[in-house]
A protein has these predicted regions:
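Glycine-rich beta-alpha junction loops
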Residues: 52-53, 225-227, 276, 280-285, ...
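Generic beta-strand/beta-sheet core signal
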Residues: 148, 184-185, 222, 279-281, ...
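A conserved regulatory-domain signal marking ACT and ACT-like small-molecule sensing domains
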Residues: 287-345
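Active-site scaffold of zinc-dependent metalloenzymes
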Residues: 272
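Nucleotide/pyrophosphate-binding catalytic subdomain
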Residues: 5-266
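Flexible, glycine/charged-enriched surface loops at secondary-structure junctions
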Residues: 104-107, 261-264, 275-284, 317, ...
Length: 345
C-alpha cells in the first residue's frame, strides 16, 4: 500500500482519520480498547466518535434514548416525569463511562443546556446529535485531543442539504494547524445555527469528510466486525471475509443491503484516492477489509459478495400504446416523487 506522507520536524509520518462506531464506544471498557488502538499508532490523529451503542443485546442505543426523551419533551407537562427520568438515564450512561475512565469531567452544564433546548422543542436532529456531541467531549478529554464541535465545521444549507464545498473550505482551514482533534460524527449545522443530521449511520460520512479535508493517507472505520463478508452470516454459515474490495463493488453491495459502512461515505475519499480500512475494535489484530479505487490483485472468487434488502414492493405498469406516449416514464416517476418514495431499478 502506498501512503502519502507529510513532514513534521523532518520526520516523515503517515496521517490517518479513525472513526469508531457506537458498539466500539458503548462503555468505559470499550473506550479503553479504543484508546489503546489510537495510542498504538501516532498516525491516528483525527478521531470521529459515534454515540454509545448497545452494551448488551437487550440494551438501548443512546441515540434511541435521546429520540424517546425528546418525544416526552414535546408532550409537555403531561410527560414531565417521564422526560426527567429518561434524561437522567441518559446522563447516567455517560457518567458511567466517565467514572470508568477515571476522568475528572462533568457534563452537568451540557445536560442543563440539553434540558432547556428540549423544553423549547428545538428539534429531533438536535436531540439525536447530542449522543455524538457528548461522546466527543469525553473522547477528547480521555485522549487529550482538541475537541471541535461538528456544528462549527460541517455545513448544511437552509434546506438541510450537505454543502460539501463550504464544509471542505471551513474544515480544511480549521484543521490546517491542528495536530490532533476529536470531531463528533453524524451532524452539522445550517446557516442559522440549527443542527442538521445525516441519515442514520452518518458518522461514517463525517469521517470520510474529515479524511478528505486533511488529505489523509488512510480512513480507518472501526466497528464490531472484521470487515465485509461475502454473505450475511445470519443467512449463510461461515461466509469468507473480503480482504480487498473496490469502491464500485462496495457501492453496489451497500445499495443492496450490506450495512458495515454507510453508502454515502465513499464519495469524499474516492475523489481523493484515500483508501478505507474496515477494522474490528474487539479484534484489532485482524486486517479487516481494505477499500480501494482499483486493484491489480486477482480475486479469490468470481463473485465479490452477495447482499440483499427486504420489504421491497414490486410495481408493474401496463398500458396500451405505452411505448409511443412521450413522457410516460417521467409522469410515473413524478408520482413517486410527489409521495416521497425512493425507487430502485
Amino acid at each position: 500500500m502506498h501512503f502519502r506522507k507529510y513532514l513534521v520536524g523532518g520526520i516523515r509520518k503517515v496521517k490517518k482519520v479513525v472513526k469508531f462506531g457506537g458498539s466500539s464506544l458503548a462503555s468505559a471498557e470499550q473506550f479503553k480498547k479504543v484508546g489503546n488502538i489510537i495510542r498504538k499508532e501516532e498516525s491516528r490523529r483525527y478521531v470521529i466518535p459515534s454515540a454509545p451503542g448497545e452494551r448488551t443485546p437487550d440494551d438501548t442505543k443512546v441515540t434511541d434514548m435521546l429520540y424517546s426523551c425528546y418525544g416526552q419533551a414535546i408532550l409537555g407537562e403531561d410527560a414531565e416525569k417521564d422526560f426527567e427520568e429518561q434524561l437522567e438515564a441518559i446522563k447516567e450512561r455517560y457518567n458511567s463511562i466517565i467514572s470508568g475512565l477515571d476522568l475528572e469531567l462533568s457534563l452537568d452544564e451540557e445536560f442543563k443546556t440539553i434540558r432547556t433546548n428540549f423544553s423549547k422543542k428545538i428539534g429531533r436532529d438536535y436531540a439525536a446529535s447530542r449522543g455524538e456531541y457528548l461522546n466527543g467531549i469525553i473522547m477528547a478529554a480521555y485522549l487529550g485531543y482538541e475537541f471541535i464541535d461538528a456544528a462549527e465545521v460541517i455545513v448544511f444549507d437552509e434546506n438541510g442539504n450537505f454543502d460539501g464545498d463550504k464544509t471542505h473550505e471551513i474544515l480544511s482551514a480549521r484543521l490546517e494547524n491542528t495536530e490532533r482533534a476529536v470531531i463528533p460524527g453524524f451532524y452539522g449545522a445550517k446557516p442559522d445555527g440549527s443542527i442538521q443530521t445525516f441519515s442514520r449511520g452518518g458518522s461514517d460520512i463525517t469521517g470520510s469528510i474529515v479524511a478528505k479535508a486533511v488529505h489523509a493517507d488512510m480512513y480507518e472505520n472501526w466497528t464490531d466486525v472484521s470487515g465485509f463478508l461475502i454473505a450475511d452470516p445470519r443467512i449463510i454459515k461461515n461466509p469468507k471475509p473480503i480482504d480487498v474490495i473496490t469502491y464500485r463493488e462496495l457501492r453496489e453491495l451497500s445499495y443492496m443491503g450490506a450495512t458495515v459502512l454507510h453508502e454515502d461515505a465513499i464519495f469524499p475519499v474516492r475523489k481523493e484516492g484515500i483508501p478505507i480500512n474496515i477494522r474490528n475494535t474487539n479484534a484489532p489484530e485482524d486486517k479487516g477489509t481494505l477499500i480501494v479505487e482499483d486493484t491489480c490483485r486477482k480475486p479469490r472468487f468470481t463473485i465479490t459478495g452477495i447482499a440483499g434488502k427486504k420489504d421491497f414492493a414490486s410495481i408493474t405498469i401496463e398500458k396500451a400504446m405505452m411505448n409511443s406516449e412521450v413522457g410516460f416514464c417521467r409522469k410515473v416517476l413524478e408520482v413517486f416523487e410527489n409521495n416521497h418514495i425512493s425507487i430502485e431499478h
